[in-house]
Amino acid sequence: MAQADMVRISVCYARPDSVFLKEFDVLQGTTIAAAIVSSGVQQVCPEIDPSTMRVGIYGKLKTPDTVVRTGDRVEIYRALTADPKLARRRRVQKTRESGTREGQKWLRGGA
């Protein structure tokens, strides 16, 4: 197998407490799904279910059948643990309760 038939990629999965990142070579024409299996991430992070988790390349959502290219970073995305709107409301409320000028800027009649 010639070196020209290989592409260098990395697979990344972030847990709240650690990050899996592996850089390796795969055959040209390898899909994202095959790259994930080849990386061994499922042995290190058994909670990964490729059939339900979203995947992407450098922050752009892709389908598992997308073919990887040299230099791609395949990312496996976890489900959100908190509603982003609710989390933002809590942060704003906490800032407002602190009594700082920053916390008052969005209130009517605020500074």
Curated annotation (Swiss-Prot):
Composition bias type Basic and acidic residues, residue spans: 94-105
Region described as Disordered: 88-111
SUPFAM superfamilies: MoaD/ThiS (SSF54285)
Annotated Pfam families: Ub-RnfH
HAMAP family: UPF0125_RnfH
Record-stated family: Belongs to the UPF0125 (RnfH) family.
The protein, known as: Protein RnfH
